[in-house]
Amino acid sequence: MGKMILVTGGARSGKSAFAEKLARESGGEVVYIATAEAWDAEMEHRIALHRNRRPSDWQTYEAPREAAEVIREAGQEHGTILFDCVTIYLSNLLCREAEPYDEAKLAALVQGEMASLIEAVQGLPEETTVLFVTNEVGAGIVPENRLARLYRDLAGLANQQLAAAADAVYAVLCGIPLRIK
């Protein structure tokens, strides 16, 4: 069974940089699973920042959806997988759904997808480590629209599910990682 580490924090908290540091320190081959899609210039810039920080020898997979299969395949040959990030992946899932949003259906969809990611990690060799990066979106103000509130709630549930299954959990605040599990 592979090892699972969850790294959470707010926007620009340093969580990705910390997860990248853990991946580099692993000493083995690293696979980077990118979940973001560039829909506008600002997102293109964010993706470029992440891409420029990564070592050139890391293998990158673009997986905006159906990432469990990518984890299964990559984890058989590589010692460390960095999945960045869960909350972007979650937004990709939600964007596929049509309005009106059925909260129970979306909760089941998210729970099922998180279970698939967890099962993929559990099926890996024990020497494989998967680092999941996620955003802590529930610590701010209550969003003004229904979809944003639903996203916040589903992200919180997804993070809880991943944290419960993780071997270690880090919260990154102001660039400082704190191990909370």
Give residue spans per PLM region.
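Residue-level signal for inorganic ion chemistry
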Residues: A19, H50, L82, N135, ...
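Structured helix-beta-strand junction loops
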Residues: S26, S56-D57, E77, L124-E127, ...
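Conserved P-loop
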Residues: I5-G75
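A basic- and aromatic-enriched beta-loop-alpha substructure that forms the phosphate/nucleotide-
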Residues: T80-L94
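Catalytic phosphate/metal-binding cores of nucleic-acid and nucleotide-processing enzymes, i.e., regions
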Residues: M1-G2, Q76-E77, A108
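Charged, low-complexity C-terminal accessory regions
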Residues: M1-K15, A23, E29, Q160-K181
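Residues at the starts of beta-strands that form the adenosine-phosphate
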Residues: G28-V31, G79, T129, A168
